[in-house]
Regions:
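Acetyl-CoA-dependent GNAT
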Residues: 2-15, 20-85, 96-98, 102, ...
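Short glycine-rich hinge loops at helix-strand junctions in the catalytic core
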Residues: 90, 107, 130
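Active-site acidic-Proline motif in GNAT/NAT acetyltransferases
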Residues: 83-85, 89, 117-118
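C-terminal "cap" of GNAT-fold acetyltransferases
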Residues: 71-75, 109-123, 127-129, 135-155
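Short acidic-aromatic loop segments in the C-terminal HATPase_c
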Residues: 81, 131-132
Length: 155
């Protein structure tokens, strides 16, 4: 999980950020200690997409206090990460559908996420799935404060 996390994050964000800020973020958020902490949180859930024996993507969702911004009766999609060579094969959509099924089973009111304002591909993906922007929040990548668009999908 550490390798796919770092690889997909670099592929998506390295072009718009400094090497120093990328390194700082990767070390803070994708260290083995941090990932173990996330996996052990009872309100966070991980689901993996495989092609043959290779993990090619994963989903991380949060409920309750595990959400990066606590929302009542909601499920946060924190990560839908798919390796570049497997994008466009409906893996991201399948992972999203898993998140939606979880939220519906738990009878939650909405699903939400934050997406970097400079990631038009992701914004278009979530808009096509029915998400609408409802707020913004700051996201720190290294020493750079960036803006995430918060998007939600009512259930």
């Amino acid at each position: 999980m550490q390798q796919i996390s770092k690889t997909t994050f670099i592929d998506t964000y390295a072009g718009g950020n400094t090497q120093e800020n990328m390194h700082a973020y990767l070390e803070a958020h994708f260290s083995l200690a941090q990932l173990k902490k996330e996996i052990s949180n009872p309100e966070s859930f991980f689901y993996f997409a495989r092609h043959k024996t290779q993990v090619v993507g994963y989903l991380k969702v949060n409920m309750g206090q595990a959400q990066s911004e606590t929302q009542k009766a909601a499920l946060e999609i924190e990560r839908i990460y798919v390796l570049k060579n497997f994008q466009g094969q409906h893996i991201g959509k399948t992972l999203f559908q898993k998140a939606l099924a979880i939220a519906q089973k738990k009878q939650l009111q909405f699903v939400w996420l934050g997406v970097w304002e400079n990631n038009p591909k992701a914004i278009a993906f979530y808009t096509a799935l029915g998400f609408i922007p409802y707020d913004k929040h700051l996201f720190k990548l290294g020493d750079d404060l960036q803006t995430d668009i918060m998007m939600r999908l009512e259930l």
